[in-house]
Amino acid sequence: MNKKIIKANRLTGEVTPPPSKSILHRYIIASSLANGVSKIENISYSDDIIATIEAMEKLGAKIEKKDNYLLIDGSKTFDKKYLNNNAEIDCNESGSTLRFLFPLSIVKKNKISFKGKGKLFKRPLNSYFENFDKYKIKYSYINKNEILLDGELKSGEYEIDGDISSQFITGLLFSLPLLNGNSKISIKGKLESSSYIDITLDCLNKFGIKIINNSYQEFIIEGNQTYKSGDYEVEADYSQVAFFLVANSIGSNIKINGLNTNSLQGDKKIIDFISQIDNWNKKEKLILDGSETPDIIPILSLKACTSKKEIEIVNIARLRIKESDRLKATVKELSKLGFDLLEKEDSILINSRKDFNKINNNSLVYLSSHSDHRIAMTIAIALTCYNGEIILDNLYCVKKSYPNFWEVFLSLGGKIYEYLG
């Protein structure tokens, strides 16, 4: 596994964050379902995005890839020659690709397999399976990293648990408008990560699809709708912006370009979290609810570690089924740098009441990315609080979401050396 020595002090400079991966996935899919050509500008070819592009091509979309834009023609999507032809969709490690396209791939009768790697198929799919059983859609595991789907999605009533992943809802919201009859999605329990549904609904509206949202407890979908092509630019990704915002709040000086202050992205909440931490002056523990923002919990934990306060980030059990057990990985790796964190079943407790400036350590500490892009990037920012060098494994797992992160890190003054040990 690739290992490098990494060091950082105060990061300074200017960054233009990558486009929102969440929005880009959705624009690619919607464009691929539209009659006509759409132009999607501001593109980053991360591993996850490449997986979605190639998947939609397998379903018949014509996608022309340019340096910073895509031209997508969906007029041939779901043509007969793309159905029942033993097609195989490789999702790599992209949960969005898998869960968005699982129902979409069978809006017409189809037999198709999905494969992936890493922990992809350890992430739950039961929310789909329970509904597929109801409508007699067949599914079977070929092996631990591949599943065969055989059947046709039907209009009707679907029930989805609200506390597992909003991706199941998004997959159905893309698919059900294309069917002949009307449909309803009912949410069991409280919907978490509702901001991702807002992004989906906004995308669908842009492409001409109308959904009735009844307070996030049910969604009414009229059938026989048609996606309309269009030209759109993808805004900056607050999931990645969060790393630089936290870096600035703990001593770096980075100018961040191109932010949409009116963004629907839930991870924009990092701004509020930073403010809450900085302005908390009570003796009791500060409690932060991470249920709506799972992707920024590692970097939020770092911010909490530097605050000289006791902070607990709660409602984050879902982090255990990400690319890694992200809750455990966050605690384990930041603890190696001298921070005081406690892993709980559904939360992280951080006690940083001691005076904090920089952690001094002259030894070379070994840290693991856990092959998780967000852990790797959190470690990079954590080094601005650390007097010393670390060894990091598999640092290029960042390609999943931010392919040029380490180039940006170097441009801001970070250091990366070969590890010859």
Task: Specify the residue positions occupied by each region the protein language model found.
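Short, structured segments at the rim of ligand-binding sites
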Residues: M1-G421
